[in-house]
């Protein structure tokens, strides 16, 4: 007997990293605050800022971290105490490790060669093996994060390596998985991107201040100018002597995370020379060509896929309408601990504009269906408000496999599409029809980039372990 398709929502963001180096010695904490706020969509569990003064005593770091949103953790007095011209920041949603204060970032490590501050976005597939190797030689860990494993290996390699960059390269040679790192040593700001380019990282500048960030929107939000993406397999080092690039980690094969363009990245960002806004418009248009519908209006589910809905409407010639009022002060549905509370949260967060839907045939566009709870409730609400038909269109293919690279996609048994047909899902959520984005349309949607589509196809760009790798570090 099949289990019920009434699942909780389950697609979560990853993390965001941000770094600044003011070459003229000005404090960066305030701009760090705004930069992290611009990346808040990438993680809402915790955040932190670590700063140091490159003109002061070497190795002295001021760090403040906490659980919650950026504007909940940091206040005016907190920022005033964070004096320094070199900073690393982080916003977190946990993909490995529990949601505790110990697991907040940036990590600050004091070791034989100095001090290392590290912020990490991504997930390692061999973190458990790397951690065990360190523990067998006496290492003691303070967190359950794979990020600490990276930091420890860099610190250990630095004992013999002539520079921090060389220690990073030696660590990368042992590492499998996704990572975008921003690291500060006492006189350097260093950005590192994994050879596949799974996680984004970019470079910008504001006057004499160099900036690194997960997304370009964080650079422009602090008044900076986006310069370029840090390339897959590239290490960029910023010092008072200039900007230096090392591409010795690069490889031919690349696999950019497709979900940056479907969901994760902010609409005003450019990632690897591709506009996120334009990518979502193309995705909606492709969906309209593959799965047309006889309907009176097209609408998106706030805020996840309004742009794809606009693309669908433009390509189909069906008018785009707003049919939901969103209460912006209600937390995201996955935060609630019980199924009943999750369902109630959907009703409170989104209310139907009845005059817009009464008697109408609706194309409803969303970015994903992972477990199905939210969509089932929305369709029920729409039909109760008088909608005649609801045709669901999803701007991603069905989720069939877990992600090992930093996206919190549940295990196979929780993914409804892995054990139920499209027709079964359609019946269970109460839709009049259901269409998913074809896998073959994804690359064109993302501007022709080589993509990681493993969560849809099971074709991982590297060897991955059996089971949930995140369980090994929780």
For each of these PLM feature ranges, what is it?
Residues 1-232, 237-295, 301, 389, ...:
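Conserved short alpha-helical segments that host acidic/polar catalytic motifs at enzyme active sites
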Residues 139, 160-161, 292-296, 314-321, ...:
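Secondary-structure transition/capping motifs at alpha-helix termini
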Residues 172, 187-188, 223-229, 249, ...:
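PRPP-dependent phosphoribosyltransferase catalytic core
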Residues 298, 305-312, 316, 320, ...:
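Extended, hydrophobic alpha-helical segments in both membrane/secreted and soluble proteins
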Residues 317-362, 373, 400-406, 410:
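Short, glycine/charge-rich flexible loops or terminal/linker lids adjacent to PRPP-binding catalytic cores
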Residues 351-365, 369-370, 394, 464-465, ...:
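Mobile, glycine- and charge-enriched loop segments
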């Amino acid at each position: 007997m099949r289990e019920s398709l009434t699942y909780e929502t389950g697609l979560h963001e990853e993390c965001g990293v941000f770094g600044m180096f003011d070459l003229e010695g000005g404090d960066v904490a305030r701009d760090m605050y705004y930069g992290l706020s611009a990346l808040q969509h990438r993680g809402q569990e915790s955040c932190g800022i670590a700063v140091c003064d490159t003109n002061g005593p070497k190795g002295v770091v001021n760090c403040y971290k906490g659980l919650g949103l950026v504007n909940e953790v940091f206040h005016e007095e907190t920022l005033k105490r964070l004096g320094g011209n070199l900073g690393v920041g982080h916003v977190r949603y946990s993909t490995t490790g529990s949601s505790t204060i110990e697991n907040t970032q940036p990590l600050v490590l004091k070791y034989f060669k100095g001090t290392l501050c590290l912020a990490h976005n991504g997930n390692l597939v061999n973190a458990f093996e790397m951690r065990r190797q360190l523990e067998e030689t006496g290492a003691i860990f303070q967190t359950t994060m794979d990020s600490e494993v990276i930091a420890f290996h860099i610190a250990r390699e630095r004992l013999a390596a002539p520079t921090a960059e060389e220690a990073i390269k030696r660590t990368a040679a042992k590492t499998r998985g996704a990572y975008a790192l921003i690291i500060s040593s006492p006189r350097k700001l260093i950005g590192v991107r994994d050879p596949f380019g799974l996680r984004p990282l970019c470079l910008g500048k504001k006057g004499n201040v160099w900036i690194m960030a997960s997304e370009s929107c964080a650079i422009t939000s602090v008044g900076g100018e986006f310069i370029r993406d840090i390339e897959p397999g590239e290490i960029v080092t910023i010092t008072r002597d200039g900007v230096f690039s090392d591409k010795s980690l690069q490889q031919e094969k690349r696999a950019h995370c497709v979900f940056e363009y479907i969901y994760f990245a902010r609409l005003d960002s450019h990632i690897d020379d591709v506009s996120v806004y334009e990518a979502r418009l193309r995705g909606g248009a492709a969906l309209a060509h593959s799965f047309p519908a006889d309907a009176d209006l097209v609408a998106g589910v706030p805020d996840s896929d309004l742009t794809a809905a606009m693309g669908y409407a433009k390509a189909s010639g069906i008018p785009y309408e707003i049919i939901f009022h969103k209460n912006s002060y209600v937390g995201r549905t996955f935060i609630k601990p019980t199924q009943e509370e999750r369902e109630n949260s959907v009703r409170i967060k989104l209310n139907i504009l009845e005059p817009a839907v009464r008697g109408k045939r609706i194309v409803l566009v969303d970015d994903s269906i992972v477990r199905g709870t939210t969509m089932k409730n929305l369709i029920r609400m729409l039909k109760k408000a008088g909608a005649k038909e609801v045709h669901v269109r999803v701007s991603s293919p069905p989720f069939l496999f877990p992600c090992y690279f930093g996206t919190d996609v549940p295990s196979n048994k929780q993914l409804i599409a892995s054990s139920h047909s499209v027709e079964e899902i359609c019946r269970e959520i109460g839709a009049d029809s259901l269409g998913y984005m074809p896998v073959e349309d994804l690359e064109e949607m993302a501007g022709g980039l080589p993509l990681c589509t493993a969560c849809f196809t099971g074709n991982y760009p590297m060897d991955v372990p059996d089971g949930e790798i995140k369980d090994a570090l929780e």
